[in-house]
UniProtKB/Swiss-Prot annotation:
The tr-type G domain, residue ranges: 11-287
Domain of life: Bacteria
Protein name according to UniProt: Elongation factor G
Signal sequence interval, chain numbering: none
Record family assignment: Belongs to the TRAFAC class translation factor GTPase superfamily. Classic translation factor GTPase family. EF-G/EF-2 subfamily.
GO cellular component: cytoplasm
Gene3D superfamilies on file: 3.30.230.10, 3.30.70.240, Elongation Factor G (Translational Gtpase), domain 3 (3.30.70.870), P-loop containing nucleotide triphosphate hydrolases (3.40.50.300), Translation factors (2.40.30.10)
Amino acid sequence: MAQKDVLTDLTKVRNIGIMAHIDAGKTTTTERILYYTGISYKIGEVHDGAATMDWMEQEQERGITITSAATTCFWNDNQINIIDTPGHVDFTVEVERSLRVLDGAVAVFDGKEGVEPQSEQVWRQADKYDVPRICFVNKMDKIGADFYFSVRTMEERLGANVIPIQLPVGSEGDFEGVVDLVEMKAKVWSADAKLGEKYDVVDIPADLQEKADEYRTKLLEAVAETDEALLEKYLGGEELTEAEIKGAIRKLTITSEAYPVLCGSAFKNKGVQPMLDAVIDYLPSPLDVPAAIGHVPGKEDEEVVRKPSTDEPFSALAFKVATHPFFGKLTYVRVYSGKVDSGSQVINSTKGKKERLGKLFQMHSNKESPVETASAGHIYAVIGLKDTTTGDTLSDPNNQIVLESMTFPDPVIEVAIEPKTKSDQEKLSLSIQKLAEEDPTFKVHLDQETGQTVIGGMGELHLDILVDRMRREFKVEANVGKPQVAYKETIKRLVEKVEFTHKKQTGGSGQFAKVLISIEPFTGEDGATYEFESKVTGGRIPREYIPSVDAGAQDAMQYGVLAGYPLVNLKVTLLDGAFHEVDSSEMAFKIAGSQVLKKAAAAAHPVILEPIMAVEVTTPEDYMGDVIGDLNSRRGQIQAMEERSGARVVKAHVPLSEMFGYVGDLRSKTQGRANYSMVFDSYAEVPANVSKEIIAKATGE
């Protein structure tokens, strides 16, 4: 089947993601889309480990999707670029980074569970980037599936204004199809079409007519309110045309005022084609979303706007780096404006480095179709970029722009890694460098005292998979320590006028620097955790030495004052100082900056912070007491309890350090009937008794 070329008419292009809770059926849904749009000949099943989008070995083994592959497909002469995003909480970085470059998304929900904790988190991330969404209630064939319950959870838990545009025909084992509330017809999949490629459009079954009328009225009321003319027509008792209704739903969806809800069962091949129609009908094209906004390199207050047109200068955002077995480094980019040919030279305006675009591809999971030109509104994979990492902007060398990047959370869990042999040591550093390029939430540092390499990530599964990839892809044999919590330190009070003088006179040129600072607790509006301000006047410290004091202070913050954990949330104000004509140097002021910070922080009531997780346990009522007792014994704070489809749900905030091995304990306490999910919530101060233990362990006392 010949691949069609990239469509130049951007009104027919959709860049979408499929987002959901871990088991709601995202990958299966994506597989079906690829099948119906004619790219896959055999439907890949996650259960067989044959899904096309899951291209790493670990993904196929674990049946979950870790890296978002970008895939292009065609539906009724429209082009859909899909980014498959993982739903497991440890992979938030993948979700964040794909939402940044999407224009719209399909949120998939489990028809039995409705909105789950992870779906809530992903939904909030999509809110952050203003991504328009349509909702697909999947797994309608599952026992206990309830479309109306799922819709209710969207309203209650997400606070979303949802408009059902379909209703299910039958449910559980008898799920046959959907009622289309726009066309007021039923679409029913016959039993003989095994792969669901054809469905029949029939009249609405009599037993559903009343419900259909009720929901149709709700839909029409929402639609009529979008436009004066429609409202008059509707109130005057005239029928609205199908085109008018679709146009109004599209308007509501693109402005994120409402979210259309559809239903189906991807696994049983029912309801996927109407969902594809809805992607085209209601989700925005690159022309419907606001133009890309950035700034001139080095001048953050000079705003630049780029419209999604090939006549504008070229600009693109790199949103993912992956290692490909043959091509080496693949960089996925979203082109926001202009066009560029393969082989052209562009500039990485974030880093100010020249880059050459080698080959350009439109990707289909992990098969590639080469293209000659990359143009606005599309997503491509590029080979040949050397210095570009996630979040960097590529632009036309003569018209530079830096686009807004992405924010990634700090790791909450760490493990120490020791290579087994000398050759493993070399392979280890190479593999770490490669993996860190791909995944910005994967952090590495050397433990000063033990000399071990410590890697940090977003959760145990995240680190497991990274270590597993080191073994498989880079053949590194290493011993992996027990997971450790990534603690931090901070200060609680203001300390004024702390001074330190660094001087050395031992023949030859000496060193001299005197600084006076105050430090105070600080949190920036944008989440910044450090600020430096100089109030030095009258040249008491020459201007060129002031940045050295800042650099020295930041160095000292890497290893805090209590137990060697990074210091965060503080502001340093340089008040005064003194220098010596001959003996002062940048180095001397850097040392003074470092020492004065340690001295000041030690006096500012330093405390240790630990990551607190938002934990949600779903348990049968019989075990409710045990579950709550256990969470309390783990220093947990119960936030809420609610009933959900016959089970009890306990929500609590629990320190990560107390959650290791929780999965086994929970199973044994509830005979395997309870399950839980946890996501990082915030950092909070550690109680005094725990703090003593942490310090004693760190200082080896």
